[in-house]
């Protein structure tokens, strides 16, 4: 298969290099198109206000001065001279569990591939304090999942969000299909003073696990399993439709009231 590989940790990150090499070793034709620096937390942002510069690192690697979504969008809308068969994003150096997926550039790169018509997988290694030890485990999981997708494709609107515990392959207890859990509210932002005495802020850490019981992605990786969560991009809150529909009469009546 022709595999487009991207990430949000940047083109020089070890995770993407190990992933690309594992996919090549499995017989795939791999093109890496990734940000020229760390763009973690970029979510689905597209660069629309300035042109995007690219740099060929080698015949199989392109660095992009943009977001993960920019990378995949450019690659699939004319920058490459061929059409890939699948998008694989990662390997991220930290978890993308639960509502992390809303902010994740790793997941968003896969999501852009799905928007543009390709099967897509996001792969993250669940590290502690960003100290990664077993990228090879996550890469092997990605190779196995890509092979399964080729043999047994999923519906066209589905992205696979894969989280791999930072364990040796022989210590992983198995794969689990999971749903997204969620976290408590994020921790407070962190104020500091710059050298000129002005206040600057760092975004605070993610909140602790909240919905993290059996069946969730949090629980799977905590118990030594590789979590596979099928996700799609329909943000409709169906449970609220009837309640909001009950407002419509009053809202419509307000149109006839005084300005």
From Swiss-Prot:
UniProt keyword terms in alphabetical order: Cytoplasm, Hydrolase, Metal-binding, Nucleotide-binding
Top EC class of this enzyme: hydrolase
Binding site for a divalent metal cation: 8-9, 40, 92
Reaction catalyzed: a ribonucleoside 5'-phosphate + H2O = a ribonucleoside + phosphate
Gene Ontology molecular function: 3'-nucleotidase activity; 5'-nucleotidase activity; exopolyphosphatase activity; metal ion binding; nucleotide binding
Predominant subcellular localization, coarse grouping: cytoplasm
Required cofactor names: a divalent metal cation
Cofactor note: Binds 1 divalent metal cation per subunit.
Location(s) in or outside the cell: Cytoplasm
Cross-referenced Gene3D superfamilies: Survival protein SurE-like phosphatase/nucleotidase (3.40.1210.10)
Domain of life: Bacteria
Any one GO CC term of the record: cytoplasm
The EC number(s) this enzyme carries: 3.1.3.5
Similarity comment text for this entry: Belongs to the SurE nucleotidase family.
Function: Nucleotidase that shows phosphatase activity on nucleoside 5'-monophosphates.
Protein name from the UniProt record: 5'-nucleotidase SurE
Natural source organism: Xanthomonas euvesicatoria pv. vesicatoria (strain 85-10) (Xanthomonas campestris pv. vesicatoria)
């Amino acid at each position: 298969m022709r595999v487009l590989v991207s990430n949000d940790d940047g083109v020089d990150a070890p995770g993407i290099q190990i992933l690309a090499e594992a996919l090549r070793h499995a017989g795939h034709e791999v093109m890496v198109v990734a940000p020229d620096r760390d763009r973690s937390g970029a979510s689905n942002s597209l660069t629309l206000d300035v042109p995007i510069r690219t740099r060929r690192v080698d015949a199989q690697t392109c660095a992009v001065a943009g977001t993960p979504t920019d990378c995949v969008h450019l690659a699939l809308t004319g920058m490459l001279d061929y059409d890939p068969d699948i998008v694989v994003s990662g390997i991220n150096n930290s978890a993308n569990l639960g509502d992390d997926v809303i902010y994740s550039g790793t997941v968003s790169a896969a999501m852009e591939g799905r928007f543009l018509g390709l099967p897509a997988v996001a792969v993250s290694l669940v590290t502690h304090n960003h100290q990664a030890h077993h990228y090879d485990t996550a890469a092997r999981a990605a190779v196995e999942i890509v092979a399964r997708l080729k043999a047994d494709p999923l519906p066209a609107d589905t992205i696979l969000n894969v989280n791999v515990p930072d364990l040796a392959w022989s210590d992983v207890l198995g794969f689990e299909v999971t749903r997204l859990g969620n976290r408590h509210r994020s921790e407070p932002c962190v104020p500091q003073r710059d050298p000129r005495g002005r206040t600057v802020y760092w975004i605070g850490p993610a909140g602790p696990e909240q919905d993290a019981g059996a069946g969730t992605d949090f629980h799977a990786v905590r118990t030594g399993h590789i979590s596979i969560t099928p996700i799609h991009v329909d943000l409709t809150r169906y449970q609220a439709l009837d309640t909001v529909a009950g407002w419509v009469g009053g809202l419509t009546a307000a149109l006839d009231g005084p300005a």
